Amino acid sequence: MASEKDLLKASPNGREMLKDGRAPKAGEIMKNPTMGNTFKLLAKHGKKGFYEGEVAEQLVKVVQDLGGYLTLDDLKHHAETGTEPVDPISLKYTGQGVGERPDGGIELWEHPPNGQGIVALMALGIIQELEKQKKIPKWSLKDHNSTQYLHTVIEALRIAFCDAHWFVTDPNVVKVPSAELISESYLAERAKLFDQKKAISAPVHGSPAHLQSDTVYFCCSDPEGNAISFINSNYGGFGTAIIPKGCGFTLQNRGANFSLDKDHPNVLAPRKRPYHTIIPGLTTYINDGSLHSVYGVMGGFMQPQGHVQVLLNQEVFKLNPQAALDSPRFCIGAGMPSADGKMTDATIYLEEGIDEKVVEELRALGHNVKQLDGYGRGMFGRGQIIRRHVDDDVQVWSGGSDLRGDGAAVPL
């Protein structure tokens, strides 16, 4: 109902994405012919069919009619810079005995800033450094979702988010030191913040975890070992809920992730890209660089947290792709910062299925814990995995699709 009202309120074209002016009921067939026309234009003209021509004209018109500032020249500029090819960033993970395997371990590849994939890389690197510093033991299978395991991964992600909150922005406008942030020396230094006996007391410069998102992730592979990891999102719910007339889609609201602090690298500015949450993931084997998996976890700021948890579930705790996704997860949430930049609240959300004793022990370590069940579990994201391995020179594929969502793993 909330989304229905948002669509009708946001622009005069809200009925285009509703059925007779209302949200479709369960089981009803919903048609969106105007979106079909937009897809035809994209198929014929590529991205020019979106950033130029009738779609672009309607997009600019609805924004200007509602008092916004957008021109056709802005869209043309974004088509050139906002869709440019980028080089991925990566981190080799060999911790917890993973590097002792014949394949040498795995390398996780993420989209670089302005995306938040660097959070997953930093967190994995910090966990790896903690093991080298002998601050954490080598985990056994029974340690999965134990108090010490969850405390370690939670704290590593909190440290990583602290840095990302400051550094992640548009690299075409402000230099982002990605290589330095995931360097072994820097991560070893950051790992020194970890305390086995209590949660870090320093403020965590995270961002609020969104209970709703309008994200779609899919992955696919072929028999030759080629694969695609793809993600797209309008951000919160239906984004702005503003619909360009005759186009069948809503405009995104990614600008919500800019900072309004004039001294912040991610400060709002014209023709600048904000901190971005959507991140497709891909892993390769270290020894030969061949494909290990393609995967992703939809869900706003849950995404790098999901990447880390799902990857560790497979590599350290030997879970298959479906079991790795089914396993209960945690999500670090955060209140908005106060005027002095300190966080007013930092909550660790735990999914039903995590042992009650573990919940209480995490509270004793100083974590502000809240348990979620039912529909609240949507906070923990919705993931998809395609996994490849070679057994006796035979290529074997497996897949998993998150029970929290409505996807499927389908062999063709």
Regions found by a protein language model. Give the residues of each.
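Active-site rim segments in enzyme catalytic domains, especially the processed small/beta chain
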Residues: 69-76, 221, 226-293, 303-304, ...
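Noncatalytic scaffold domains of N-terminal-nucleophile
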Residues: 1-52, 56-106, 112-115
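Extended C-terminal regions of large enzymes
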Residues: 101, 106-118, 285-303
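Short, small/polar residue-rich loop motifs at catalytic or cofactor-binding pockets
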Residues: 85, 212-215, 276-278
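Alpha-helical support elements that line or immediately flank enzyme active sites
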Residues: 45, 49-52, 57, 125-129, ...
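Extended C-terminal subregions enriched in glycine
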Residues: 161-163, 170-173, 271-272, 307, ...
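Short, well-structured alpha-helical segments that form the helix of a local strand-helix-strand
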Residues: 53, 57-61, 140-161, 321-331
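Internal maturation/activation junctions in enzymes
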Residues: 21, 68, 129-234, 247, ...
